[in-house]
Amino acid sequence: MIVVKIGGSVICKDASRVIQNLPKYADKAVVVHGGGCLVNEVMKKMGIEPKYLTHPGGLVSRYTDLETLKAFVMAMGWINKYIVASLHALGVEALGLTGADLGVVKAKRKERVLVVDERGRQRVVDGGYVGRITEVDAAKLAPPPLKVLAPLAVSERGELLNVDGDQLAFDVARGVKADKLVLLSDVDGLYIGGKVVPRLTAEEAEALVKSEEVRGGMKRKLLMAAEAAKLGIEVIISNGLADLPIDSALNGGGTHITKNL
């Protein structure tokens, strides 16, 4: 089994190459997608200003109040059904889901989160409608049909919750006992010193999170990759805008993170 995460940067630029490559893997894959840029577009049309939280360690996340959650659900619903419809045109039976559907992804709402304000001070703020994943029902994600999963979960109280897409992809990979987790974005892999790093161990990936050369979403990807690699899941960070991007990743392209070299 493999898990393919289609990052928001790919979704908002051109997801066609990934989608065209998916039929080859339809009987042994689960797809997870993002789409933050479309969320921002929907929010703008609703007159809502996107807000972000910076956490200790430098990780950044979207602040999700109720109005933001509504925009998030709308955007992710569109992306999800766009992917499913595109796969249908290629002869692939696909089922688009959020984590709330069939209760496939459960999460606990983060009531409070620790953030760093603009003055560099740490403080605790309301967590909004953001969840920490507690359970993935792997049996419901097994193909056929090919499952396409949006990064939304459901709480025990029936709340829809925004969950991090990379974290969701990792939890799905762990749940379905995947051999490989392919994280597709708009870069060729992890760049250090201006060059793509072809291979890393889990330990090396963890150490690089603290590097000033690793920023933004790549920090989170490396943290998830290190955790997955320790469980024996090979993680590949690769370019989803390339020709046959899944083939390319599985055949040595991008940055490969494993437990040991």
Curated annotation (Swiss-Prot):
NCBIfam families: argB (TIGR00761), PRK14058.1-4 (NF010662)
Residues involved in substrate binding: 35-36, 62, 162
PANTHER family: N-ACETYLGLUTAMATE SYNTHASE, N-ACETYLGLUTAMATE SYNTHASE, MITOCHONDRIAL
One GO cellular component term noted in the UniProt record for this chain: cytoplasm
Pathway: Amino-acid biosynthesis; L-lysine biosynthesis via AAA pathway; L-lysine from L-alpha-aminoadipate (Thermus route): step 2/5; Amino-acid biosynthesis; L-arginine biosynthesis
Record protein name field: Putative [LysW]-aminoadipate/[LysW]-glutamate kinase
EC number: 2.7.2.17, 2.7.2.19
Superkingdom of the source species: Archaea
Main location: cytoplasm
Record site feature (Transition state stabilizer), residues: 5, 221
Keywords, in A-Z order: Amino-acid biosynthesis, Arginine biosynthesis, ATP-binding, Cytoplasm, Kinase, Lysine biosynthesis, Nucleotide-binding, Transferase
Family: Belongs to the acetylglutamate kinase family. LysZ subfamily.
HAMAP family on file: LysZ
Pfam family, one: AA_kinase
Subcellular location: Cytoplasm
MF GO annotations: acetylglutamate kinase activity; ATP binding; N2-acetyl-L-aminoadipate kinase activity
Stored Gene3D superfamilies: Acetylglutamate kinase-like
One GO BP annotation of this record: lysine biosynthetic process via aminoadipic acid
ATP-binding listed as a keyword: yes
